[in-house]
């Protein structure tokens, strides 16, 4: 509906990527039909009654143009910009396109070539910047741009002490030039005026009211391009030219020349009385904003409004397409941006202003009546049971028949606004055949008697709406999708049979609605022809289409070539566990694999049974032996985790020798030497020294430090003072009823439970049993 303003010129001029046609035409940038009289009927995508849609008409006039309205240049990276003078094939320097946009700014606003230059020094810097950017790809086109008749002009802004002109690109070739205005007192910097947010400190020339006021920190002179269709500023969430990094081979310069791209997205605007569709991140009461701005600012409210209707996570650079083609905004009439010239066909500047004024005024009046900012809030509310009727009532109004142009409009314009200007055009070099074949076959595969289910315009994103509402939004579509499933007889697939009770939402649960395979899921005309295109549209997720830039012709043409017969025969190889939808293989989670046990012989089943019995016997054996050698288990599993310990049997107080425990040769000091078992080895160490675990000697008085002291709880015995002289008699007492442990005489020990201090799980409780005679065995 709104995308062909620029593509008409591209269709005429870019078959061979000869961008001079655009660069040398002052009127060609914004006069819709100045060079293309054959494409006047393509200005409104929704009014085309041809089954092949308006996109097919574009292909009839342009053999080398892709039938995506946003990307009609076969090899032109800047699909939407007829103003791009540097669209060399497959050149990825996005800075080359800034020059043409500044040129368009001159053409649009009629800057005076002699009076509106701020300063010759600054102007020279700007030309140097343009030359630097264009030398990367096309010096010839650059020379055609910078000439006496059509050179980019910098808007006049007075009292600016530094002229900073550089590209919005991440290109290493961007040139930043600064020059001082001679004779101007450098009282304050330009950024100081802007930080005060006092418009009066900056003297804007009234004659040049169309000056671009950029309040970014770096104060780029942004590239204003008239051919941004709906005259809206694209707030791109700080992506601007960088956002096409995912499509460097396809559309690197595409999105950035359609709009004014903001660095910080807070205060950029165009003070132009013809441009009412100003998009800002936050509502503003500033008088410089137009009166109707508050009703339209939801278009770019952090891109959330667009994300509700489009899976728009990375490359949402054509917000006006989302806005005017959205089924929820269907009450908005078609604004006459596609015919900006006078009725008499004269391509003068007055026609543009009149067309914009009339179209926007009429459109805004209807918007005020039918659609306000509250509609965005209304969608943000909890989705109730009337959600089905909301879609059905709002979807078909003001739309052309779904089986004709609207279906392809979904394919090529709105399927996945991650690449608005590059829908169905992952590969500018290859998608010519891909899209042409697809659209030529769509007419014959459409079911004219079946209604549309839903459009790709309605594709809520998980990233922007709550999971509850996302689930309900597709759950509400379950009923029509079930009908759609039954009517298309997908259950009779030659590869896999699915019960008719299975709904499409269940089949596509993991693939489609996660936006990981199908992009934005357009199910129009009761066939799944659009699935081929959707896979090509999602450049962010579908690695197959993004990486195989040279193979899309083979992939998609093979699929689309059989759409006329709808016979599912071309891709039936190796379709086990898949459902073939119009020759497009789609993996589904419901496909049941053959039961392996059905193919096993009786002998194999017996062997399996025997193995299971053996395992059960082993388990029972372990259970029967679990109480044996419990002290050894206790030692290996628990005591070995402590640095120092001694274990006495309850009835036999002699020291149990787990290792080669020789006599306490060092037990001569008052400091009490003892054997410590560290990781299964004997370590003779004095208490004065810190062992490698930095623990203290355990006894009944330091149990808070060492939990092993719990083992040494005695039921009776002498106090430590009474056995102070028994340090050297440890060996002689080995066969008595008492034993020496440091300064403590122990006669009897009671069994205790060692419990893991961090949990109370019974599995972590180890019981110490008495009279375990097999502890050393």
Swiss-Prot record:
Biased composition (Basic and acidic residues): 597-606
Organism in which the protein naturally occurs: Dictyostelium discoideum
Protein name, per record: Putative uncharacterized protein DDB_G0287457
Biased composition (Low complexity): 128-147, 243-265, 408-466, 532-574, 731-740
Disordered: annotated segments: 1-101, 128-150, 219-267, 334-366, 391-466, 529-577, 590-622, 713-751
Comp. bias intervals (Acidic residues): 344-366, 607-620, 718-730
Comp. bias intervals (Polar residues): 334-343, 391-407
Cysteine disulfide partners in this protein: none
């Amino acid at each position: 509906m709104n995308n062909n303003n620029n593509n008409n010129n591209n269709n005429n001029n870019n078959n061979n990527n000869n961008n001079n046609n655009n660069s040398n035409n002052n009127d060609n940038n914004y006069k819709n039909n100045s060079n293309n009289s054959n494409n006047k009927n393509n200005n409104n995508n929704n009014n085309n009654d041809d089954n092949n849609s308006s996109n097919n008409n574009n292909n009839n006039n342009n053999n080398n143009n892709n039938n995506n309205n946003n990307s009609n240049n076969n090899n032109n990276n800047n699909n939407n910009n007829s103003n791009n003078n540097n669209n060399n094939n497959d050149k990825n320097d996005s800075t080359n396109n800034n020059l043409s946009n500044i040129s368009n700014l001159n053409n649009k606003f009629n800057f005076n070539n002699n009076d509106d230059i701020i300063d010759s020094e600054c102007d020279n810097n700007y030309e140097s910047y343009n030359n630097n950017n264009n030398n990367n790809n096309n010096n010839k086109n650059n020379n055609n741009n910078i000439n006496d008749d059509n050179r980019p002009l910098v808007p006049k802004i007075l009292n600016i002490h530094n002229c900073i002109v550089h590209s919005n690109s991440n290109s290493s070739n961007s040139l930043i030039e600064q020059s001082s205005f001679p004779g101007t007192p450098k009282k304050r910097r330009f950024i100081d005026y802007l930080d005060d947010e006092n418009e009066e400190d900056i003297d804007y020339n009234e004659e040049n009211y169309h000056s671009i006021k950029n309040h970014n920190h770096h104060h780029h002179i942004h590239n204003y391009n008239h051919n941004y269709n709906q005259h809206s500023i694209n707030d791109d969430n700080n992506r601007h030219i960088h956002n096409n990094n995912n499509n460097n081979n396809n559309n690197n310069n595409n999105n950035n020349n359609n709009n004014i791209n903001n660095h910080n997205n807070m205060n950029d605007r165009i003070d132009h009385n013809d441009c009412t569709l100003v998009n800002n991140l936050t509502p503003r009461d500033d008088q410089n904003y137009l009166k109707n701005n508050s009703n339209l600012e939801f278009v770019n409210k952090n891109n959330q409004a667009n994300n509700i209707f489009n899976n728009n996570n990375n490359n949402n650079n054509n917000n006006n397409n989302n806005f005017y083609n959205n089924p929820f905004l269907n009450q908005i009439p078609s604004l006459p941006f596609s015919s900006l010239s006078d009725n008499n066909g004269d391509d003068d500047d007055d026609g543009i202003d009149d067309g914009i004024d009339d179209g926007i005024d009429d459109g805004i009046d209807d918007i005020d009546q039918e659609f306000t900012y509250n509609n965005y809030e209304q969608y943000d509310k909890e989705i109730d049971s009337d959600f089905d009727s909301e879609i059905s009532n709002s979807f078909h109004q003001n739309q052309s028949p779904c089986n004709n142009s609207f279906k392809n409009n979904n394919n090529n314009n709105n399927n996945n606004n991650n690449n608005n200007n590059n829908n169905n055009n992952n590969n500018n070099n290859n998608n010519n055949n891909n899209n042409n074949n697809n659209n030529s076959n769509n007419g014959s595969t459409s079911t004219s008697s079946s209604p549309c289910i839903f459009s790709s315009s309605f594709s809520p994103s998980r990233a922007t709406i709550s999971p509850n509402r996302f689930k309900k939004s597709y759950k509400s579509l379950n009923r029509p999708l079930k009908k759609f499933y039954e009517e298309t007889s997908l259950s009779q697939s030659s590869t896999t049979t699915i019960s008719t009770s299975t709904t499409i939402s269940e089949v596509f649960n993991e693939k489609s609605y996660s936006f990981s395979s199908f992009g934005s899921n357009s199910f129009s005309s009761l066939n799944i022809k659009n699935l081929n295109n959707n896979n090509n549209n999602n450049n962010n997720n579908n690695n197959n289409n993004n990486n195989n830039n040279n193979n899309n012709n083979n992939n998609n043409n093979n699929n689309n070539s059989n759409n006329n017969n709808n016979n599912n025969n071309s891709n039936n190889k190796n379709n086990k566990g898949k459902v073939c939808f119009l020759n497009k293989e789609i993996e589904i989670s419901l496909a049941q694999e053959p039961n392996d046990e059905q193919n096993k012989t009786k002998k194999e089943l017996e062997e399996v049974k025997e193995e299971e019995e053996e395992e059960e016997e082993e388990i029972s054996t372990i259970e029967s032996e679990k109480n044996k050698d419990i002290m050894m288990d206790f030692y290996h599993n628990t005591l070995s985790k402590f640095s120092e310990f001694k274990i006495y049997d309850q009835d036999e107080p002699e020291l149990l020798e787990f290792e080669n425990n020789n006599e306490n040769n060092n037990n001569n000091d008052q400091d009490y030497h003892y054997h410590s078992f560290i990781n299964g080895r004997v370590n003779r160490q004095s208490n004065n020294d810190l062992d490698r675990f930095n623990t203290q000697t355990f006894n009944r008085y330091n149990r808070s430090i060492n939990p092993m002291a719990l083992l040494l709880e005695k039921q009776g015995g002498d106090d430590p003072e009474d056995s102070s002289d028994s340090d050297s008699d440890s060996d002689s007492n080995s066969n008595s009823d008492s034993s020496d442990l440091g300064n403590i005489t122990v006669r009897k020990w009671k069994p205790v439970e060692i419990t893991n201090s961090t949990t109370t799980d019974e599995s972590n409780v180890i019981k110490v049993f008495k009279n375990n005679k097999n502890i050393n065995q």
